[in-house]
Amino acid sequence: MEYSPDGRFEDGQSLMAINRDYPAVDYTTRDRGKTVEITTRSMVIKYTKSQGPLGDGNLLITSPKRKGVKPFAWRPGQKDTLNLKGTYRTLDGYDGNMHGDQPMPIEDGLLSRSGWTFIDDSQNYLFDHSDWQWVSHRREEGKAQDWYFMAYGHDYRKALRDFTVVSGKMALPPRYAFGYWWSRYWCYTDNE
């Protein structure tokens, strides 16, 4: 979902969204005058037509009323209390998950028991269109909205697959780059 004050939308690659040319999704649209409703297999998006940015007053995303679909309702700004959390950037100074007497502040991750994920890509840098791509600022920095909403129920593999369609495949180093790993928890004897 995108909002731009000048009506020009960003289709270039960002640090998160490498691929903006994803496969088409089956959907139906209903224009009800002041509102528009877009229904897919996974969600129903209800948008109240307005001149301002997307917000809790003009956007509601719900689950379709279908057997086997985990029910949810989401509005912008709503906190996901069932998020499974993500990763932490550094463990320097931590003892387990504690830094002194403070627990580690872990940001929301991609997966949630709520069955949905909201990703705000509005502040990420874009890649320019040069042969040797470099980062560039957005035209409407701080004013435009570039959001992704994924509804997947408890099919976490589908969530990961869908995310890699947008973000690109994750590069993994080859196994040989890790060298020889061997570990056991008891002490070695002289004979070993």
Model region roles, listed by residue range:
Residues 1-33:
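A low-complexity, Ser/Thr/Gly/Pro-enriched, surface-exposed linker/loop concept
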Residues 29-175, 183-185:
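Catalytic and substrate-binding clefts that recognize carbohydrates or anionic sugar/phosphate headgroups
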Residues 180:
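Conserved, well-structured core segments
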Residues 188-192:
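Short, acidic/polar
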